[in-house]
Amino acid sequence: MDENFIKKEFDATKWDEIKPFAKELLERRLNCANCIETLIADASELGEHISEAGALLYIDMTCNTEDIDKKNAFLEFSTNVRPKLSEFSDKLNRKIIDHPKLDNLPERYNLIIKSIRTDIEIFRKENIPLSVRQTELVTESQSINGSMTVVFDGKERTLPEMNVYLESKNRIERAAAWKKISDRRMEDHERLTEIFEELI
């Protein structure tokens, strides 16, 4: 591909900014096998932008578990953008597979086409809300676990910071650290159990 499909900066975490690109891909006329190749390449380029944006939101959230704005930004992406992307991807996949010149594509596209066919087979629109709910629950669980702290040895510490005390050669110190961690986990045990049971 001589030039990029996306020629301007855009916020790939917002559906309103993704939508024009998605619309163009879905409505593009495909008059030749080469046109299908370009469509696949352009869709891949768009997907890379969105995947990178989503990954950065996730990293920001997990590195700042007590930052409500970062958590909400990730949840907004997961509950508003990803469901629409799922439907868009399915429509685009069917557009590609249904094209009469699909068999004229070079052999190097065989694995891509096989993957697209598999995606079409497993896609179920009714599963989208379930996936959204799963993300919400996992995010809540991560937020709860990430915000857990205890006061130990005169200082407030996160649970990962307590691991060093669990490896202490001093048996009394190890036991005290274990009890602190256990007691703190019990404070959120009920909600975490509810989340786990809903996930399974």
Task: Describe each PLM feature range.
Residues 1-200:
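A well-structured
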